[in-house]
Amino acid sequence: MAGGDRGSGGTGNVRRLVIVESPTKARKIAGYLGSNYVVESSRGHIRDLPRNAADVPAKFKSEPWARLGVNVDQNFEPLYIVSPEKKSTVTELKGLLKDVDELYLATDGDREGEAIAWHLLETLKPRVPVKRMVFHEITEPAIRNAAENPRDLDIALVDAQETRRILDRLYGYEVSPVLWKKVAPKLSAGRVQSVATRIIVQRERERMAFHSASYWDVTAELDASVSDPSASPPKFTAKLNTVDGRRVATGRDFDSLGQLKRPDEVLVLDEASAGALASGLRGAQLAVTSVEQKPYTRRPYAPFMTSTLQQEAARKLRFSSERTMSIAQRLYENGYITYMRTDSTTLSESAINAARTQARQLYGEEYVHPSPRQYTRKVKNAQEAHEAIRPAGDVFQTPGQLHSALDTDEFRLYELIWQRTVASQMADARGTTLSLRIGGSASSGEQVVFNASGRTITFPGFLKAYVESIDELAGGESDDAESRLPNLTQGQRVDAADLSADGHQTSPPARYTEASLIKALEELGIGRPSTYSSIIKTIQDRGYVQKKGSALVPSWVAFAVVGLLEQHFGRLVDYDFTAAMEDELDEIANGQEQRTNWLNNFYFGGEHGVEGSIARAGGLKQLVGGNLEGIDAREVNSIKVFDDSEGRPVYVRVGRNGPYLERMVDDPDNPGEQKPQRANLKEDLTPDELTPELAEKLFATPQEGRSLGIDPETGHEIVAKDGRFGPYVTEVLPEPEDGGDDGTAGTPAKKGKKPTGPKPRTGSLFRSMDLETVTLEDALKLLSLPRVVGVDPTTNEEITAQNGRYGPYLKRGTDSRSLATEDQIFTITLDEALKIYAEPKRRGRQAASAPPLRELGNDPVSGKPMVIKDGRFGPYVTDGETNASLRKGDDVLTITDERASELLADRRARGPVKKKAPAKKAAKKAPAKKAAAKKA
């Protein structure tokens, strides 16, 4: 709880309770309000729809709609429950309400914030006047103005949020079970996440279908000093453009199948012809045939809104969208920037003045645009248009002034926002572009024309403060790039000083990055800027997408899920339909559409919407129920990738234990019949890397592995295999014999359980070993692990040397220490091991505790390194002070620093572990000028 210590922001001795979302925000605001204000935080949402069946109160468990948490038979009335971890917060807030005269709900001013305010109102049931306090930056003037000018709760915004919440619940809870039954457990479908996954899968399909084409070109280094000794620069490069009047083909002249789009219009050079031209032109005298000079002007970029901030932070700072929003949240709550969830590029008059003043002070009058620049955009589905994201206050603090107050990430993002805002009020960049055409003859008689293009910036204008980055996978040229050419005139002679022939391959379309995916979603009108970060995180957490560098790569599971949805629920992942649904949801918020009618049509069907809409197809419920039995799980999980050289289809099958290759081949034991041939697929193999040649290699790898010989001690065969997680060796155990009358051997396992029996020993190959060359001796060493080094005489505990997933280590009881090399596993002595244990425990790669499953970056709160460890109840993240279990959907190998720090922050916010909460009680909520909802 925070109380103000400044002069009163209100009148008289009226006591006011101000509720915000976060403790940080509460502390900051309390400092700006008077002693008559008590500021407390709700720590986010205090209630929501049930998360699972256990959350549903007993009185509703028998209801047919209970699993949804929405009474679809009673106007789609939501069932709200107070989160168990928030009950103490609610009790505390109710206690504070007893000692105040007014309640100010000061949550964020968007849909989500308005909904939090409404839920607080419904849960706390205050008996004092209630006002809505709204601000978009946490500065003293803004907070005082908001306190002095409160408004009423905006029920239209609450309705907008609640409708989306209900829609997403219906979509997810009806469609996700289809994926569980037909693809794999723990998968999920969502209104936006499924479309985002489809966009990424579609791009990978394009890459897989792509056929590369080869072409050659000729580059000349031309010397202008032969005719003008003062030419600057004297030498420049030019590309061969035409040969005997025919344009030389470039990559853009080929289609995705590697064929020319207009074969009659271009000339494709091969290595021989390009080389001959280069040789024939070396030393040739050429002349300028045309000079075209144009003025160049570039206007500044608009200030940031949520989506453009995420895109630019990804390109320039390499931040994920989740990381960007987390940092921006901290900057906002500490009063450094305005609210970071906005789709507006507008600046207030005071912000424009602040930006212009700072640009004038830092760069000079000539760098400031003559008049204030205002950036407006027509946003079809804009929500609560605030200001753009900018530095807070009427006078901006420069990054240098905040250097000591911000951590590294905060400083970098603030600097980006500050630069973009100041640059938006600066003058245009100006310069000239120059295009030259240079012609001549090759020694073999061909008439050739070279092109050269240049750009010179004569006045940088806003580029002095800020240059936007380009997407690294898409390519392109930045706005401040210059390419200078000499000032030549038509007819002027130039010599070909050097020529080179270069070969090229056309490239498949680039994979999406977080930045380009956000841009694509925005252009399609799908989702909202405030949700893009969580959507990208969700599709990675669910295993649909993984990052390879900055590229988003779909998994084979994503292919199966998208294929199922396209084939059986096509409208749900149709881009235009999803965008149109956003329009309709906004019409509800604007009062142009009745919420209950719209939800009824969507779920149960009706005449609502265009031909082919979900409503006209009978509604979501019928669509799911009617299609479920008709979905062939094997067909859905079979992705045809290509035909082999004999015309046999090759499929990737998505199995319960991962994807694998399969094709049908002749069965030598049964002439005239066929049998499946299978091959493992490695986890790190991306879909577009699977070629017919690689498939043949994988099929040729024996499933039973490469036999290394017989273990002389056991008589078991030892084989080397290549598995999903890399190469390993294992022993082949004999088939169990049938049991005797006593049933002690060969007893069949109970239904649903795997047969019991000895498991084969296995061992991963060292990094220094190769699957093709590993020997029986190597394998037996690996299978002998862990190796007993000796017994510690002080503790009487056994010390072993082992090979873990993340490297070699020693283990003594629960105390483990990393080893420097794999060879030490077999060579380290007891004395050497004891010396290692005699050293103090260290973090990181020399950690003294059990070797971590994975090492991460530093936690932004504690500043200490985070690691993933394997605990009694499963993997957890720790910074040495706070432990937080990984949750459903979190994966040790793919969890990000942002997600790990989020888990730690959530664990800190929940405080010490509490005893099990009592059973939830449900009660009807009182209407507040909107449709009623159940709550508990």
Curated annotation (Swiss-Prot):
Location of the region described as Interaction with DNA in the Swiss-Prot/TrEMBL record: 188-193
PANTHER family: DNA TOPOISOMERASE, DNA TOPOISOMERASE, TYPE IA, CORE
Any Pfam family the entry gives: Toprim
Family: Belongs to the type IA topoisomerase family.
Catalyzed reactions per annotation: ATP-independent breakage of single-stranded DNA, followed by passage and rejoining
SMART domains registered for this protein in UniProt: TOP1Ac (SM00437), TOP1Bc (SM00436), TOPRIM (SM00493)
Domain Topo IA-type catalytic: 154-611
Alphabetical UniProt keywords: DNA-binding, Isomerase, Magnesium, Metal-binding, Topoisomerase
InterPro entries in the record: Topo_IA, Topo_IA_2, Topo_IA_AS, Topo_IA_cen, Topo_IA_cen_sub1, Topo_IA_cen_sub2, Topo_IA_cen_sub3, Topo_IA_core_domain
Annotated site residues (Interaction with DNA) in this chain: H45, R164, R165, D168, Y173, W180, R341, R542
UniProt: Mg(2+) binding residues: E21, D108
Record NCBIfam families: topA_bact (TIGR01051)
Subunit structure: Monomer.
Cofactor(s) required for function per UniProt: Mg(2+)
One GO molecular-function entry: metal ion binding
GO BP field: DNA topological change
Temperature sensitivity of activity: Optimum temperature is 30-42 degrees Celsius. Partially active up to 65 degrees Celsius.
Basic residues compositional bias, start-end: 910-936
EC number: 5.6.2.1
Protein name stated in the entry: DNA topoisomerase 1
Biological function: Releases the supercoiling and torsional tension of DNA, which is introduced during the DNA replication and transcription, by transiently cleaving and rejoining one strand of the DNA duplex. Introduces a single-strand break via transesterification at a target site in duplex DNA. The scissile phosphodiester is attacked by the catalytic tyrosine of the enzyme, resulting in the formation of a DNA-(5'-phosphotyrosyl)-enzyme intermediate and the expulsion of a 3'-OH DNA strand. The free DNA strand then undergoes passage around the unbroken strand, thus removing DNA supercoils. Relaxes negatively (but not positively) supercoiled DNA, concatanates and knots circular ssDNA at 52 but not 37 degrees Celsius. Preferentially nicks supercoiled DNA at C(G/T)CTT, cutting between the TT residues, binds ss and dsDNA with the recognition site.
Chain residue ranges for the region called Disordered: 661-688, 732-767, 841-884, 903-936
Gene: topA
Active site: residue positions: Y339
Domain Toprim stretches: 15-139
